[in-house]
Regions:
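A generic structural micro-feature
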Residues: 19-21, 79-81, 108-112, 124-126
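Glycine-rich portal/gate segments that line the openings of hydrophobic small-molecule binding cavities
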Residues: 30, 50, 59-109, 161-170
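Beta-strand elements of well-folded, non-transmembrane domains
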Residues: 31-33, 81, 136-140
C-alpha cells in the first residue's frame, strides 16, 4: 500500500490545531478518483447516508453556516436511534480538508470533545489519498473507553470501505 505520511501531515496538523484531545483512530487510502470529485462527494452532506455506516438518511442544516455546506453547517445523520447525530463543520478548505465535531450525545457516554478531520490529497501517480482522523476524549470507564475506540474503528473503517467500493482503491 505504501507510506502515506506525506499525505497525512495536513490532516494531523489540522487536528492538532483544532483539538487538544488525542488521536483515537486513523484510516488512509488511495482511491482511483480525482481530488475534486472525492472531496465534493464526502462534503455533500445530503449524500452522507450513501457511505457512512449506519446512516439511513442525511441532510444539511445551513441555518448557521457562513457559506452553505461550509463552516457552521451541520450534517444531520439519522440512523436507527431516535435522535439524529449532529456534526458541525469547524474548518473547510475545498477541495482539500473538512473538519467537523459531533455532539457528545451521539457517543452515548463513550467519547466527548470529538473532532473528525478528512483530507483529500492528489497522488502524483494518479488518484487521491484520503485521510480520515478521529480525535476525542474516551470515557474514564475502561469498558466504555474500549467500546468508544471500537465505535471509531467500525465507523471510520466501514465508511472508508464504502468509499473504496464507490471509487476503487489503488
Amino acid at each position: 500500500m505504501g507510506d502515506f505520511s506525506d499525505f497525512t501531515a495536513y490532516a494531523k496538523e489540522t487536528g492538532g490545531r483544532l483539538s487538544d484531545q488525542p488521536l483515537l483512530f486513523e484510516t488512509t487510502k488511495r482511491l482511483d478518483v480525482t481530488q475534486h470529485e472525492l472531496f465534493n462527494y464526502v462534503s455533500d452532506f445530503d449524500r452522507s447516508s450513501e457511505w457512512i455506516i449506519g446512516a439511513r438518511k442525511s441532510w444539511t442544516d445551513n441555518s448557521e453556516a457562513e457559506v452553505p455546506g461550509e463552516v457552521g453547517a451541520v450534517r444531520v445523520i439519522k440512523s436507527g436511534g431516535s435522535t439524529p447525530v449532529l456534526e458541525r463543520v469547524k474548518a473547510y478548505d475545498a477541495p482539500r480538508m473538512l473538519a467537523y465535531c459531533a455532539n457528545d450525545e451521539a457517543f452515548l457516554g463513550l467519547c466527548s470533545d470529538h473532532l473528525g478531520v478528512m483530507t483529500c490529497e492528489p497522488h502524483p501517480d494518479g488518484g487521491t489519498v484520503i485521510c480520515w482522523l478521529a480525535y476525542g476524549r474516551l470515557a474514564s470507564n475502561p469498558l466504555k473507553a474500549w467500546a468508544g475506540k471500537k465505535l471509531f474503528q467500525v465507523a471510520l473503517g466501514g465508511g472508508m470501505k464504502n468509499l473504496e467500493r464507490k471509487f476503487s482503491s489503488r
